[in-house]
Amino acid sequence: MKHLFLSALILLGLTSCQIAGLTSGYSHLSDAQKERVITLEENIDDIHDFSKVYKVSLNQVKQYIETHDKVLLYNYTPFCHSTYCVSPAALVPQCKDKGINVLVISNIYDDIFKQKHTTFPMLMIDTKQFPTKWRAKYLDLFYSPLTGHTDKELNYANFHYFEKGKYVKSYKNSNDI
């Protein structure tokens, strides 16, 4: 009887757990937050309302890279506190001073609205374009066609640099850019 009660208690605890990071996390958003997530229909350059999160396709990002001389894609994880993760609000002006356009592309919705961004758009991978709900898989499916490398081959770098439409290099540390 004691083991049955303990097993039931553990099972109840596990069913109430929410594991962040395996999927996009869209289901974790409140209804008000979901209303602020917009599927972008036009070009990335046409975004002027920075209070929303814009789901972007691989083709929209390719088009942006092809039409700007220097582009840095930041594979952004909002809740990351590693030394390799930086605030987009700090990264964007640092790169603009070097003449580099930055696209901050979140790879998950968890904590995406905690960061204030008033000078750049917050983008999110439109996961519906890929045949998987698993974050690690859709990240590879999104970035591999752009860089020509898998996430593992790039040693899981979060900063991908392009010049004149061509992939140049990926960086783990934003200070190396």
Where do the model's predicted regions map?
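Bacterial signal peptide processing site
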Residues: Q18-G21
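A short, hydrophobic beta-strand/beta-hairpin element that forms part of a small beta-sheet core
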Residues: N155-S170
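Short active-site neighborhood of thiol/selenol oxidoreductases, capturing the structured segment around
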Residues: K62-A90, L103
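C-terminal motif of bacterial Sec signal peptides marking the signal peptidase cleavage site
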Residues: G13-S16
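Post-signal peptide N-terminal segment of mature Sec-exported envelope proteins
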Residues: Y26-D46
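Short, internal strand/loop/helix patches
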Residues: H117-E153
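Structural microenvironment flanking redox-active thiols in thiol-disulfide oxidoreductases
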Residues: Y84-M124
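Positively charged n-region of N-terminal signal peptides that target proteins for export
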Residues: M1-L4
